[in-house]
Amino acid sequence: MISLTSWLVCGNPLAAQELQAKITINHAQISGTDNSVFENLQQTLERFVNERQWTSLHFQKNERINCNFNLTVGKYDKDQNIFTCKALIQANRPVYNSAYTTTIYNNVDESFTFKFAQFDQLEFNEETLDNQLAALFAYYAYLIIGIDLDTFSPMGGEDVLQRCMNLTNNAQNLDFPGWKAFDNNRNRYALIADYLDGAMQPFRQLQYDYYRKGLDEMANNAERGRTEITTTLEENLKKARENKPLSLLPQIWTDYKKDELANIYKGKG
């Protein structure tokens, strides 16, 4: 069984890496380029994400958050070392007392453009950002960890999500798309700003109620878990939509939850 408290202990000397990421680089659209550059990119990114300790939280090895980054390279300028991609980012969480894993994040970043030369080493300092590729993966590392923590305690990811917002503000000087406020309502800035908007607290509460009080309870008492899920959907999801109609967070969440929700209510009219 996975220990809930291990996600919540700060400053532990045994703190370890939080993420177990799998990176996939789909470069089928690119011809005439040595595949080794894509292989090196994939290996560099997995080391960067998986070997770094992003917070002071204590995660056992078997508690690391499984996540996937599927990058599709649309253009590659080998003279300038610029990759123009879109990225599908997904993160999962185990459900207590079961073999089932549930998705906690699934979204496409259409502005995943960066510079990378083969054998580059990624350096990262969130206060003085000067590397777009490191900033992209740090952003999603903080976002995923913060969302995961929200599923284990109400607003539990606040500190980590604030770090994600701080990084986003510091990334404004990077000359790449996706970081600017008001560019569109689905870019990286818009997503993290919405998570931290007080009007979206019902959406954050939904994460705890749905996963911890709902799914985690279903192995012991399916009806009680289902009731918790119904209540939070009717109250918190509805309230989040009313509070901020232009936010895409509820729609993104509903899109990747629709199949799971159908299974939860299967045979229940």
Regions found by a protein language model. Give the residues of each.
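Start-of-domain marker
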Residues: 17-84, 95-97
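Bacterial Sec-dependent N-terminal signal peptides
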Residues: 1-19
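Alpha-helical segments in soluble extracytoplasmic regions
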Residues: 170-236
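Second-shell loop/turn segments in exported
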Residues: 28-35, 123-131, 243
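Acidic/His-rich structured neighborhood in mature extracellular/periplasmic domains
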Residues: 79-190
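A cross-kingdom marker for long, charged
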Residues: 24, 211-269
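Sec-exported extracytoplasmic/periplasmic mature domains
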Residues: 46-54, 142, 146-150, 262, ...
